[in-house]
Amino acid sequence: MDANERKALISRYRDGHRAIVKALEGLREEELDRSASDEWTPRMIAHHLADSEMTSAIRLRRLVAEDGPVISGYDEAQFAKKLTTDRPIEPSLEAMRWARESTAQILERLTEEDWLRAGTHSERGPYSVEDWLTIYANHGHDHAKQIERSRGRS
């Protein structure tokens, strides 16, 4: 991956929060708990993104700061099932926003050597900083599309 590709992915990563906020815009409280078919509800997605952002932010920091870290997976479905219920989504959206902004600032300052750093993901195997960026650059946008489906927009 070259510097221009990384820059584009960092921009997309940073934009993920905006995409989520736009997808949620205008939803009434009761609509936060409706989903398209068997997908997560918008409320579950908002809370999942906060959990995911906090987890992924630490993963990236470990990849950059530690030599060959083991990056632990977690059971996203259980987090969604047990931790989302009826909580307001605003704190989770703020957690997502701040975790992404802080992490984007780190990404923008990585050296070529930093981009080559890697560890081992407990579920995926070899896991590099570039792998991390490729996954999380699209994560918010993918869930924004899921919210749009719950609204019947796609």
Regions from the PLM with identified roles:
Residues E31-A77, A104, E112-S154:
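Short, contiguous alpha-helical
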Residues D2-E29, D51-I58, R62, I135-N138:
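Alpha-helical bundle segments that constitute or directly flank the non-heme di-iron/ferroxidase center
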Residues D2-A8, A19, L27-R28, Y74-D75, ...:
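General structural signal for secondary-structure boundaries
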